Amino acid sequence: SKQIRPTTKDPKVFYELGQAYYYNKEYVKADSSFSKLIELKPSLYIGYFWRARANAAQDPETKLGIAKPYYEKVIELCSANGEKYEDELIESNEYIGYYYTIHRDKAKADVAWNKILKLDPKNTKALNGLKMK
């Protein structure tokens, strides 16, 4: 399919376009749209969050960790309002925890798992992550 090139500076257009590409499994195009959203609104977490998802979908085994910098930015932008962004913070830290687990850095993985447990003490992914050697 052809890439749509909006001439607008309206971030909402790039958000909606990125979502359309994402749900159509066109992850590279989604990433490009969310990149433009970040360019227009760098202080908003949502562009980084969806860019992280688009990159995670391109690296399903998390071998390359291409979503990591975007999930880290989500954590940075959302941590001050943890209750409001609980779902986003949990998803972001789950990715980070898993990334460090498969890359054999238990100390960094455990930091991510513990951040999740502060928001959701019964989170099974985090509890299981902490049990891993």
Where are these regions (language model features)?
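Conserved structural position within tetratricopeptide repeats
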Residues: 2-6, 35-39, 76, 83-84, ...
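Residue-level recognition of tetratricopeptide repeat
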Residues: 10, 44, 89, 122-123
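Structural motif corresponding to the intra-repeat A-B loop/turn of tetratricopeptide repeats
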Residues: 24, 58-61, 103
